[in-house]
Amino acid sequence: PCSSDNEEAVMEYARRLADLQEQVKDQIFIVMRVYTAKPRTNGDGYKGLMHQPDTHAAPSFVDGLKAVRHLHYRVITETGLTTADELLYPASLPYVEDLISYHAIGARSVEDQEHRFVSSGISAPTGMKNPTSGNLSVMFNAIYAAQHPQNFLFNAQAVETSGNPLAHAILRGGLDASGKNIPNYHYEDLLA
């Protein structure tokens, strides 16, 4: 789910997905999307489990990180599935990287140098979306940066990475110059 904040609903979906995985295990390996932080274009609105695990209480990142770990752990241990999450906050990576087997860099984050560089040090598949504009060159530059060695400051430390050969594209739709939605599945739209 895009907003994995209702634990029991997520677990019900996970059990169904695990049943499907069993049926197709010879053809495909399913990784469950468990997105726990929601990017917001203007910063308003509910920001997900990471921010506010209890919607009736004040936001709490400490409680949010505990809830995120708990949810990923439950999906993994109770269903046997592995999980994917959007890496909205690179600083949260050390708290969840032992549980998450696939990371996504979203459309609003893909142009950010810190996301690109942190991705270059992740030892798991990391998908880069094209930005909200749909611009593919931005996504390709992000993939290039993530696949190559980088050195940068992260969490108050100098970091050197060797590159992530598993960085790849996640295609989403976009907008053309006139603001019209364009799909991501026609060859001619991808080349435009």
Model regions and ranges:
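Active-site-facing alpha/beta catalytic cores
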Residues: 5-190
